[in-house]
Amino acid sequence: MFHLSRRAVLLGAAAALAPRFAWAEVDNEDAWFNGTITDHGVTFRATNMGMVPAVFRKQLVHYQHNQRAGTIVIDTNANFLYLALENNQAIRYGVGVGREGFQWFGEARIDRKAEWPGWTPPPEMLKRQPDLPKYMPGGADNPLGARALYLYRDGKDLGYRIHGTTEPWTIGWDVSSGCIRMLDEDVIDLYGRAPIGTKVVVMERVS
């Protein structure tokens, strides 16, 4: 059974509803966490990886591609993010992607990175959800999670980020307003592998 909790309104607002998954919110949230991790002075709840479907856990895979090593490729159909490596290999992560009406595709570049980023909801989101805070400082309860990689095109901020999440049960679902969300542990890992200037390719969705 799924429900919309008060916590979901406050902390899951950055993602909102997914048509195929009424709310990526579960009754027993605590089951998705196991202990804590302290990172750069912030203590956050560690993901219980046993709750994450094996296909969406970080893993080294064979991946046929024609991208330069270090390129990030996001498969919005399968909810995978690939970090391309040499010899047709990649590190694959499970991700949450944009819900219907908020999907996008094309090329971008990481032009900014932040650890424990603050969150400023965009004006269009505030219009849809006027109860949201105008700004939320970075920390363990911030919807952007432990890291954010900011996506630009031709020097312009697209408004989309690759970021962590306080809701690990949403990985593998179409849940966001266009951002790419990852487990906090995974986005910390990717953050260390993807420097400023990294090319990002978001594949077009196939109906």
Residue ranges and their predicted role:
Residues F2-S207:
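N-terminal pre-domains immediately preceding structured catalytic cores
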